[in-house]
């Protein structure tokens, strides 16, 4: 346990040097001394009733004076009030813990004894349990609200049994439990003024937990087969085990197929986006084609000799082409002029020969 202490601050005294404060009360924030005691859970499990610690505690109890309900509520018993609660506590769950918590909080100072029924009586009167009696004993004794555990508690509890344990009160819910010769097992404790009523936790019980397991039986069997349990350990036949294994394979393929489709969807989005970027009018392919055309047109024209002030690129190519065409035209004109001159010479020679001939030659 730990103790938290807050100290009270001293008040300021009046002085003669401040007469203006004589008729004014000086108030200062102060807190009273408070001791907050909180019990912490033990790091040891609760003892069994036949162990030395429980026996010593029981023998030290003065059971000669009957503890009434009023005395217990007012914490006037002079010792911890001993309360007994019993049950099967199969598959110990929060509904069981809530019942024991309610009992522990009945009075300011409670010593809680929990009786756990053994397998023999439980199987006889209620049916088979999921966990064994030893597992149920250990499950209860590790609950923080429990001070002592009574193993193989009687199925039909009696007043004499409680007195032997020096129990002051017995706690249970208000549902009647039929016993041989009795309509309600706990009615006699009501008459003795020893009965305390607890409330059941709605929505949870051992039967509900078992019902959930049965409802989803196939899922749990398939899961445990995947985890390495053998069909024999699960009490499953060969055909049933084969069916579950096939179902597991089918589910695995479905899962992989869904994953593949999801991956393909994301990849297809990327492919479509790349296609649009490539073949769009402003895309990469058209830009590449434009660059390729420019390169090919430049490769077909002679490279200009680089000098300062000379045109470059397409302009230079066009200027060069015009100059070549002009030179070719001049050459053709020269050839034509030369042919005309030659033709004139031939005509002159023929005319001179004709003049030199006599008439007899004709």
Curated annotation (Swiss-Prot):
EC supergroup of this enzyme: transferase
Entry keywords, A to Z: Lipid biosynthesis, Lipid metabolism, Nucleotidyltransferase, Phospholipid biosynthesis, Phospholipid metabolism, Transferase
Protein's organism: Caenorhabditis elegans
GO MF entries: choline-phosphate cytidylyltransferase activity; phosphatidylcholine binding
Gene name, Swiss-Prot/TrEMBL: pcyt-1
Catalytic activity from the UniProt record: phosphocholine + CTP + H(+) = CDP-choline + diphosphate
Comp. bias regions, Basic residues: 346-356
Pathway: Phospholipid metabolism; phosphatidylcholine biosynthesis; phosphatidylcholine from phosphocholine: step 1/2
Protein name: Putative choline-phosphate cytidylyltransferase
Family in the record: Belongs to the cytidylyltransferase family.
Amino acids binding CTP: 88-96, 126, 172-173, 177, 200-204
Residues binding substrate, per UniProt: 126, 155
Taxonomy, superkingdom: Eukaryota
Biased composition (Basic and acidic residues): 1-16, 332-345
PANTHER family membership: CHOLINE-PHOSPHATE CYTIDYLYLTRANSFERASE, CYTIDYLYLTRANSFERASE
NAD listed as a keyword: no
Pfam families from the UniProt entry: CTP_transf_like (PF01467)
Region (Disordered): 1-25, 296-362
Compositionally biased tracts (Acidic residues): 321-331
InterPro entries: CCT (IPR041723), Cyt_trans-like (IPR004821), Pcy1-like (IPR045049), Rossmann-like_a/b/a_fold (IPR014729)
One Gene Ontology term from the biological process aspect of the record: phosphatidylcholine biosynthetic process
Record EC number: 2.7.7.15
């Amino acid at each position: 346990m730990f103790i938290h202490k807050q100290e009270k601050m001293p008040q300021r005294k009046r002085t003669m040097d401040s007469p203006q404060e004589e008729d004014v009360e000086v108030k200062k924030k102060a807190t009273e001394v408070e001791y907050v005691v909180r019990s912490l859970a033990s790091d040891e499990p609760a003892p069994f009733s036949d162990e030395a610690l429980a026996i010593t505690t029981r023998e030290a109890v003065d059971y000669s004076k009957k503890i009434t309900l009023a005395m217990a509520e007012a914490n006037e018993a002079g010792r911890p009030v001993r309360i007994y609660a019993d049950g099967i506590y199969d598959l110990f769950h929060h509904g069981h813990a809530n019942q024991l918590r309610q009992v522990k909080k009945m009075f300011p100072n409670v010593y809680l004894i929990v009786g756990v029924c053994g397998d023999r009586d439980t199987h006889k009167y209620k049916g088979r349990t999921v966990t064994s009696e030893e597992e149920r004993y250990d499950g209860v004794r590790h609950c923080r609200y429990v001070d002592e555990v009574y193993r193989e508690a009687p199925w039909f509890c009696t007043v004499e049994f409680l007195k032997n344990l020096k129990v002051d009160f017995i706690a249970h819910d208000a549902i009647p439990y039929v016993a041989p010769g009795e309509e309600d097992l706990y009615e006699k404790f009501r008459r003795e003024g020893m009965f305390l009523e607890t409330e059941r936790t709605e929505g949870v019980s051992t039967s509900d937990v078992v019902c959930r397991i049965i409802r989803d039986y196939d899922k749990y069997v398939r899961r445990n087969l995947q985890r390495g349990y053998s069909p024999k350990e699960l009490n499953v036949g060969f055909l049933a085990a084969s069916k579950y294994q096939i179902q597991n394979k089918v589910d695995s393929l479905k899962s992989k197929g869904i994953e593949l489709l999801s991956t393909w969807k994301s990849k297809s989005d990327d492919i479509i986006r790349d296609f649009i970027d490539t073949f769009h009018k402003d895309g990469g392919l058209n830009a590449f084609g434009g660059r390729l055309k420019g390169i090919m047109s430049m490769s077909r024209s002679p490279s200009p000799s680089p000098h300062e002030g000379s045109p470059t690129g397409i302009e230079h190519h066009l200027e060069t082409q015009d100059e070549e065409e002009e030179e070719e035209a001049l050459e053709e004109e020269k050839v034509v002029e030369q042919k005309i001159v030659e033709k004139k010479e031939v005509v002159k020679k023929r005319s001179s020969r004709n003049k030199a001939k006599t008439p007899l030659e004709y």
